[in-house]
Regions:
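Glycine-rich phosphate-binding loop and adjoining helix at the ATP-binding site
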Residues: 32, 41-52, 56, 65-67, ...
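Short glycine-aspartate micro-motif
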Residues: 5-11, 66-68, 132-137
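Conserved A3 ("GATE") glycine/threonine-rich loop of ANL adenylate-forming enzymes
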Residues: 15-16, 113-115, 140-142
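A gly/ser-rich beta-alpha-beta helix-loop segment of oxidoreductase catalytic cores
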Residues: 125, 138-140
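Short glycine-rich, Thr/Ser-proximal phosphate-binding strand/loop in the N-terminal lobe
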Residues: 2-49, 80-82
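Phosphate- and other anionic-substrate recognition elements at nucleic-acid/protein interfaces
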Residues: 62
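Conserved Radical SAM active-site core
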Residues: 59
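Short beta-strand scaffold segments in enzyme catalytic cores
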Residues: 17-21, 73, 142-143
Length: 143
């Protein structure tokens, strides 16, 4: 029988891969986040191994709940089309399929800045705002 749990959010960054269970009603982390240094080189397989570590760390809380993964890249339908702060071997990688195979869970992969914008509209200062909303991200890279 499937074990329900809290969805897990994972952000793949240039210097660290961070993850935590997420309370989708409040738009907040449900537990303190875990950060693991981004492997060098940050190939798809190496990053998938770190994602596995994060999934294992939060297994009790997340059960078999879906995982959302953000990456610093252009992503269309789960496929990475560029590579900023990650290895160029990501280009044309079906990241959703790769991570679903590694974790055994439903995985959705999107661009990190896109995810931040959507979260801001649903939970943050842009909630209920009509018109254009601009979000700038600053990290190892600028989005």
């Amino acid at each position: 029988m499937a074990k329900k749990g809290t969805p897990l959010g994972i952000d793949v960054g240039g210097s660290g891969i961070k993850g935590a269970p997420v309370n989708l009603k409040r738009g907040e982390l449900a537990s303190p986040r875990l950060k693991i240094l981004t492997p060098s080189p940050a190939t798809p397989e190496a990053v998938a191994d770190v994602v596995d570590q994060i999934v294992d760390h939060f297994a009790k809380e997340t059960g078999d709940a879906p995982i959302g993964v953000t990456v610093p890249a252009v992503v269309i339908h789960g496929t990475v089309l560029s590579a900023a702060n990650i290895d160029p071997s990501w280009i044309e990688t079906d990241a959703e399929s790769l991570l679903q195979e590694h974790t055994g869970r439903k995985v959705t992969v999107v661009n990190d800045a896109d995810a931040a914008g959507v979260a801001e509209v649903h939970y943050g200062a842009a909630k209920g705002v009509k018109g254009l909303v601009i979000l700038t991200t600053l990290g190892t890279g600028i989005g």
